[in-house]
Structures are given as structure tokens and as C-alpha cells.
A protein has these predicted regions:
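Structured alpha/beta reader/binder surfaces that contact nucleic acids or chromatin modification marks
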Residues: 1-111
Length: 111
């Protein structure tokens, strides 16, 4: 079974590129290194979030590299990606997670 990750985040592409990837999350290192894709969905709850689409809209799918950077001062991880495609799928977060509170969810890639 191949896995990907669904992320509920507020950053835009430029901010992710400045971070060096999709970060910073408390994910399992070994599991994160084997993820295929990340689907980014928009979270608008933070003051600094990019307000470009409705809450929960899937905005981007990223091909992950398997490279995971660890923050110096915590166990948070940043997932590097090699390519991406912009998408616009309203309510993706709500539909795929039942609006769960945890800001990411591992998903089977083929589902």
C-alpha cells in the first residue's frame, strides 16, 4: 500500500518554497520518507493564512521527494517536493476527513 498525505494548511506556494517544502508538521519520520504525494487543502483559521479560496478547498498536489527536513528546535518535519500542480476542489478537507481537527491525514494513494 502506497501512502500520501492530506494537509490542512494556510501557506501559499511562495511560503512553502521559502520553507524548503511543506512544513512544519509533527509527522512520523519513517512514514514521511515513504509518502508519494501531498494534497494541500486551505485552512483559514490562522491570522496569517492566505485567503485565496474557501476553507477546506484542495489547492495543490505535490510530488514528494522522500527527503524530510527536521527542525533544529523541535520534532517538526518539512516535506520536500519536486513538482506540483494547482487544483481547485471545494470541500476536499471536509469530505476526506469528516472535518477532523488534526491538520493532516495519511491516505492511501490509490483512493
Amino acid at each position: 500500500m502506497r501512502e500520501s498525505i492530506l494537509i490542512f494548511g494556510g501557506k501559499n506556494l511562495k511560503e512553502m518554497e521559502e520553507d524548503g517544502g511543506i512544513g512544519w508538521w509533527y509527522v512520523n519520520q519513517e512514514r514521511a520518507e515513504n509518502l508519494e504525494y501531498a494534497v494541500i487543502t486551505r485552512c483559514l483559521t490562522q491570522e496569517w493564512a492566505t485567503h485565496d479560496v474557501e476553507q477546506g478547498t484542495a489547492i495543490m498536489i505535490c510530488k514528494l521527494t522522500g527527503m524530510v527536513d527536521k527542525a533544529i528546535d523541535s520534532n517538526r518535519k518539512c516535506l520536500r517536493f519536486s513538482s506540483y500542480a494547482k487544483i481547485n476542489i471545494p470541500n476536499a478537507w471536509q469530505k476526506m476527513t469528516n472535518s477532523q481537527r488534526n491538520p493532516f491525514k495519511y491516505i492511501e494513494t490509490n483512493k
